[in-house]
Amino acid sequence: MPSDCPRPSDASSGSDSHPASRPVSRPVSPVSRVARLARLARLARPRLTPSYVLAHVALYLLACLLLQTSPLATALPGYTGPHAVGTVDLELPLARPVVTSPAVRKLDASPAFRLETVLLSLYYPTAQGLRSVVVLLSPPRRRRHHHHHYWVPRPVHLTARGFARFAGVDNPVARCLCWLAVWLGAGFVTIPAEVDAPLLPEHAGPLPVVVFSHGMAGSRTHYSHYLGELASRGVVAAAVEHRDGSSPATVVQRAAAAAAAASSSSARPVVHFDQSDLLHPDGSAVSLPQLKAQQLAFRDAELLQALAVLRALHAGNGSALHAASSRGEGAHLPSFRGRLDLAALVLAGHSYGATGALQALAHPSAAHVAGAIVLDPGKQSGPLRDQVRVPLLVVHSDAWSRAATDFFGRPHFDAVRDLAAGALARTNAAWFLTILGTSHPSVTDAPLLYPLLMRWAAGAKLGAREALTQYVGVSLDFIHFIKTGRRGDGMLGQNVTHETYDKWVSKERQQSYPEDLARLWQVHMRM
């Protein structure tokens, strides 16, 4: 064996005979270990490339789609009263369609203000722990358990087109962008009330009733939390959907049999329109004041029809209403027989809806209305009817009272104060208050869905839930007054603090007014 080749014995015994040739193991210092981990972290760290960001956004949107959650909106919270809340959509045909104003659409010369059906959402108290079982009457018959209404009514693309028209950019690109915004913003938001749940058991006694009218660019779903909170405390609230062109979009849906008899489609979409879309029968243009008068007349007719529905419900016609409704809900309507306290019926509205509610009070069919709740009565919706002859509660948002708006030659705040003063003189029961830190949309669901956006856009300082708590509390106090004649210990029992906005009536009143109320309320007029 050549002498320069390693021998097996050398290899096997090298560790003993040649210790210097063995590698030396050196301890790793903590600093070196940290450095190695840092290098590994840099290698593992994703690079924020456009493709990486888009991939993660796509995964997030896909997860939202699969889970049916809206990526840009917060879920509506549950109700806090002692009762759970049920809801039913009812759309009922008139015995004979009514044309409330002669204006026609430019597009097809069809009547712009033709009232065929009335659509309303009922919110009512139900027992805790119940789950809905919805049986749809129209084919195919199917049962849906634990069903909730969507906050954005279907089809979504109609609502998107309505918002595009509000923005004045009704073209295919704008519609697509609005559709995407609506889907991402609220497409899967649901109202946390159980559809078709049974009414609270009869031992609860007669239930007070509120009929509510939504504002411009709103719909019957946009006040679901305010009305649901009332329902969770024993009130039956009916939110009316207005088809006067002031809503982004709505669908007039007649029962299939009625539509077949009339040889027409069972669904007629109504997308937002304004005076530029209308003509008088003689071909002349419709002015903005004329449009508002026609819209309010149409709203009055819808509110009066809603009152008639509630009277029929109380009279025991629930089964007939269920059968006539094109929405397929209302299996428990017969249980409403004799359950409504129509002697304590309150007509309410927000913004444009508040103006309409005041106007509807003048109609003989509204003679049995016991009181009115007026939230931010409209500034651009025409004159306010000031001959109110029922107890009246006017609640302004902070933004509504603070802005010095000209209203037919005088400050809007002064006009509203005189409205309340007239009601006080005629009925000895009227209040005018401002909730501090709130904005015009504070009574709607929008601040709950988009808290940061609404604070930035609308300027509200009071939290969304606290604001709604105040609206609900003062409304319940007023309903209690209508029912019992007693003001209670809430805001209706407080003396005047500010006859004009943000100006104390006296230093003595400022010192006597509780601090916890002073940060929230100004009382401008009281019984």
Where are these regions (language model features)?
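Short substrate-entry loop that stabilizes the transition state in hydrolases
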Residues: 187-207, 212-250, 402-404
